[in-house]
Regions:
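Collagen/collagen-like triple-helix recognition
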Residues: 2-32
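Extracellular or exported targeting regions of proteins
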Residues: 30-131, 135-171
Length: 171
């Protein structure tokens, strides 16, 4: 017996089955922006150390960028506008070259000074109450074009407003 002949009509769809169990919640991949303020001294070896609190989860694949508050200016309405620069940043001083630099792990950020002269000769304006903005970009969010030199572009990309930036003063 052989099955030959024209193909028959398409059958009807079956009944929908019962919904399966819900899957586990996924990880909420969110970026974070933190401002830290600290002072470089001989006692802290001219470095500022910030350990991420347990409320901030940073993965090894995430990107951590640090910006330095370089200056403050005014807009046409007389409102203050912060000028941020992506680190590292180098200043040319009478004593020589001074570089503000950083490194990070998924546990912490270390911001430090490097120079070709004795750092104890620095003026307080170069060391005291310096403000840095740390931006944590999840690896999943860094695909495509993003101007990381512009903190406003980074914050917009992460969906973070100025009011949502956590402020931390280090001792």
């Amino acid at each position: 017996i052989s099955c030959e002949g024209p193909q028959g009509p398409q059958g009807f769809d079956g009944f929908d089955g019962a919904d399966g169990a819900d899957g586990a919640d996924g990880v909420n991949i969110l970026g974070k922006v933190i401002d830290i303020q600290g002072t470089f001294t001989l006692d802290n070896d001219y470095s500022i150390f910030y350990e991420f609190p347990q409320t901030i989860e940073v993965f090894e694949t995430d990107v951590v960028l640090v910006y330095m508050l370089w200056d403050v200016t005014e807009d046409s309405n007389g409102e203050s506008v912060d000028i941020w620069r992506l680190m590292p940043q180098t200043r040319i001083l009478d004593q020589g070259l001074l570089q503000y630099n950083y490194d990070y792990t998924f546990f912490d950020v270390s911001i430090f000074l490097e120079s070709d002269f004795d750092l104890s000769t620095l003026q307080p304006g170069d060391t005291d109450d310096q403000v840095f903005r740390i931006a944590i970009l999840p690896a999943e969010s860094t695909t495509g074009k993003l101007d990381t030199s512009n903190i406003n572009s980074v914050m917009s990309h992460l969906g973070i407003t100025e009011d949502e930036v956590q402020k931390v003063t280090l001792q």
